[in-house]
Amino acid sequence: TTWSAHCRQEGERLGYDMSALGDTARITEPINADIAASTQLLFEETYLATVRSLGKMLAGDGMMTKNLCLSGGTALNCPSNSRVWREGPFENVFIEPTCDDGGLAIGASLHLYHNLLDHPIAASDTPATAYLGGAYGDNELAVALAVDGIASESPDDPAEAAANDLLADKIIGWFEGKSEAGPRALGHRSILADVRSAENWRRVNQVEGREPWRPFAPF
């Protein structure tokens, strides 16, 4: 029995309104929300069991380490990562910012270069950073704003101005330095809102053009 067939059978047995199943206009109704939550929990349990099995295998071979590095699309699942960190056998869990398919390609190339072609890994004192993308100067930003007719000003303290806007329940876009590598916004190209307002969940999703139920990453 497939997972989808199992969910359908259980939904009918438990008396859910099955007419809403898969209907994007009714995506938050119980049958859809509960299947999504159950699928997430199943994924978390499978993910955690895999990590625990890895820990046991390493320990059995005398190779136990305190460190775990996760990559691939599954490592973009933040609730699962949190459980692996809290409940798994590894003390330190690292998820690199480009853990999607693009990052896997980079990792495969580095593995080939260093492990198969035997090129040494050069020592570096440069701190690792996720901010590897493009940076733009004030003139470039002014031109981009002018093209769309957007008025701008330059406050003496941008952080204070942003904090005041957030306190006034405004949604702001934060643009700073180089852009992030990988699919996640990590503070240099981010949309920010006051988390104390439940309404901001809907507002930010509306600004981003996303479905109203989509979650956010706290920062």
Residue spans of the language-model regions?
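Flexible beta->alpha loop and helix N-cap segments adjacent to enzyme active/binding sites
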Residues: 1-21, 25-26, 56, 67, ...
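Short acidic-aromatic active-site loops that bind/stabilize oxyanions
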Residues: 25, 29-45
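Phosphate/ATP-binding catalytic cores across multiple sugar-kinase/actin-like superfamilies
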Residues: 38-64
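Active-site metal-binding loops of divalent metal-dependent hydrolases
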Residues: 74
